[in-house]
A protein has these predicted regions:
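Structured catalytic-domain cores with a bias toward divalent-metal coordination
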Residues: 1-217
Length: 217
């Protein structure tokens, strides 16, 4: 199998880019039997930061505006980026709306890689509101694009059960099948669905900086 893992296409959602390095290290260094078997039977493509300019802009903001002693208050300047923020690329365009149009160099390179490898699964790692939990697809079924096959959605649900089981075993809050959708094919989690692959969106509650208080702690 070929698995394409894409991280932080929105630059101010940095947990994906940060975790991608840990993922690469874990895959390279682990002697775990499961990981060795996985690597023997899979090709894993890691796109550690799909929006490097946005991530750099975000990092510059939070590192310049953080307190010497970390302050988790949401009103702190660190968590309130000035426009244009780190979500967009160098040209201030949302790259997660450019998968179909492919007008930007990051998108063109990414789609070229996608077409070269034709991955079975593409993961798209994002962040959402600080007071949320964790989301993984499938999304709202009534907002799935009509050209997306039933087989695609059935496999997405099957993969979701695997995630749910592991979240339950670790007492981690999550939700699935609501709020987010699979309609517009210009996004990283849906572009694969019309191109013979399975796109999976992951959304993690964001700190939007170094540390931020939330209703969950």
């Amino acid at each position: 199998s070929v698995i394409y893992q894409g991280f932080s296409i929105h630059g101010n959602e940095p947990s994906g880019a940060n975790s991608s390095i840990l993922l690469a290290y874990y895959l390279a260094a682990s002697n775990d039997k499961f990981i060795i078997e996985l690597l023997n039977n899979s090709i894993i493509l890691i796109d550690p930061c799909m929006n490097p300019d946005g991530l750099q802009r975000f990092a510059s903001w939070v590192n310049s505006n953080k307190s010497k002693t970390p302050n988790g208050n949401s009103y702190d300047r660190e968590f309130n980026e000035a426009w244009p923020r780190g979500r967009t690329n160098h040209y201030w365009f949302d790259l997660n709306r450019d998968w179909l149009a492919a007008q930007h160099p990051e998108s063109q390179a990414r789609i070229k890689t996608f077409n070269k490898w034709i991955p079975h699964i593409l993961t798209d790692h994002h962040e959402m509101e600080t007071n949320s939990t964790f989301f993984f697809q499938p999304g709202v079924q009534s907002r799935t694009h009509p050209l997306t096959s039933k087989a695609n959605q059935d496999l997405t649900k099957k993969i979701a059960k695997y995630h749910a089981k592991n979240f339950d075993n670790n007492d981690v809050l999550y939700f699935s099948g609501e709020r987010f959708d699979d309609f517009f094919y210009g996004k990283g989690s849906t572009f694969p669905d019309i191109n013979g692959s399975i796109g999976i969106l992951f959304e993690q509650a964001s700190s939007r900086g170094h540390i931020q208080n939330s209703v969950n702690g």
